[in-house]
Amino acid sequence: MPEICPICGLPKDLCVCEEIAKEEQKIKVYVTKRRFGKLMTVVDGFDADLIDVKDLAKKLKDICACGGTVKKDSIELQGDHRRKAEETLIKMGFSKDMIDVR
């Protein structure tokens, strides 16, 4: 018996909850200054119940070739990676209209 999605009630192989969540979430990408004047790119606005934020952070860190962490459903990347993060999120299926880059 296949696993059932707790959100939509469909089998896991037919579940589209994550795809729908990617299209509907308002994501903010911005840069902040941290200690010693270092820049930190923050990608915020994910619903951790619908999207695997840790897996997404791993992919972003690999593509941007930087370090980073996940804190309170947001991803922090070391350095200024706003454009790369935006391009990567669009390639992963997030809607371009719902990504706000500052």
UniProtKB/Swiss-Prot annotation:
Under SUPFAM superfamilies, the record lists: eIF1-like (SSF55159)
Q: Which GO terms describe its molecular function?
A: mRNA binding; translation initiation factor activity
In the UniProt record, the signal sequence range is none
Which InterPro entries does this UniProt record tie to the protein? DENR/SUI1_TIF (IPR050318), SUI1 (IPR001950), SUI1_arc (IPR022851), SUI1_arc_bac (IPR005872), SUI1_dom_sf (IPR036877)
Keyword tags: Protein biosynthesis, Translation regulation
Q: Which NCBIfam families match?
A: PRK00939.1, SUI1_rel
The record's PANTHER family line, in alphabetical order, gives: DENSITY-REGULATED PROTEIN, DENSITY-REGULATED PROTEIN HOMOLOG
Mind telling me what this protein is named?
Protein translation factor SUI1 homolog
